[in-house]
Amino acid sequence: MKKICIVASKYYEDIINMLVSGVNDVLNNHKKKIKTKIIYVPGVFEIPYAISKNLKKYDAFIALGCVIKGETPHFDFISKSSIDAIIKLSIESKKPIGNGILTCLNKNQAIERADKSNKNKGKEAANAAIELLINDN
């Protein structure tokens, strides 16, 4: 049985709950049995650390978070450094990491991208991780 760890930021809890729900829909409806665990971290910046710490325990990961642009460059630093770290972890560990981290200009954009009746990026991240894991691409 394959094991997938969902690592989700607690920041913007309403958005994260929508993303987690989308991931759960995909995982619960998948043909093959997949064991899952969810780990919550304070923010997007902590997601790579949690993945790194758990690399040996899981076959794949799904990263969920939300960064909304404010008035300072904080958005740019957090978004880029977190995504770069996740990509590096995936390449070096040769383990799939579905990216469900939203980087939005405002909360309405985040809601739109997390809405299950719309584009839910959590679903997309779960599908990507599963496809790479199951097909061993």
Enumerate the language-model features and the residues they cover.
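Glycine-rich phosphate/diphosphate-binding loop of Rossmann-like nucleotide-binding domains
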Residues: 2-38, 42
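Short, ordered loop/turn segments at secondary-structure junctions
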Residues: 10-11, 66-67, 102-106
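Short beta-strand segments at enzyme active-site cores
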Residues: 38, 60-64, 96-102
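Glycine-rich phosphate-binding loop
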Residues: 49-86
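Short, acidic/small-residue loops that bind anionic groups at enzyme active sites
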Residues: 76-103
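Phosphate-binding/catalytic loops
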Residues: 105-120
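A charged, well-structured terminal subsegment
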Residues: 118-137
